[in-house]
Amino acid sequence: MSKNCVLKGTLIQLENDETKEIELLKAGEKLLSYSIEGIENTQDVSLLGKTKVNNFEGEFSYQLIKNIWKNTFESYYKINNELSITEDHYVICKKNDEYYWIQVENLKIGDSLFKLDNSFEEIKDIQKIEEEKTVYNIQVNSIYTFFANGYLVHNGSANCPNVTDCYACYHA
């Protein structure tokens, strides 16, 4: 069962070069997304990782936030001391000149992740941390990616089955 999320406090890239902590986002705000040519644009995580491309090209766009989900998760991964993310969350990976979506738990030292500055950063440190934390995910309207602490991540399924609290972004 999927709980693909990022931790509370993660900065999400919005329009106009603005960033905001994920837990402070509201429905109707626009976040920065990235569509990759040749890789299926789907919210169905069962299809992710099945397509690999040898030429990485894509396009930045802005997507409307529809919902934000809050949950707890008993462990997470910390990548390069910058990105804290649950094990089943998908990130775009470069390995051996191939590009594809991969679950965080399958990443290895030496793999590279796509960054907001249009570059790939090599993973030099990845740690699994066994500690319960509050986590969040975002539902957007069409391109199912966003930048979390500067890394491109996929938002997974809109029908996240373990969501305990669907905010619908009703922040007072």
Where are these regions (language model features)?
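HINT superfamily self-processing domains
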Residues: 1-161, 165-171
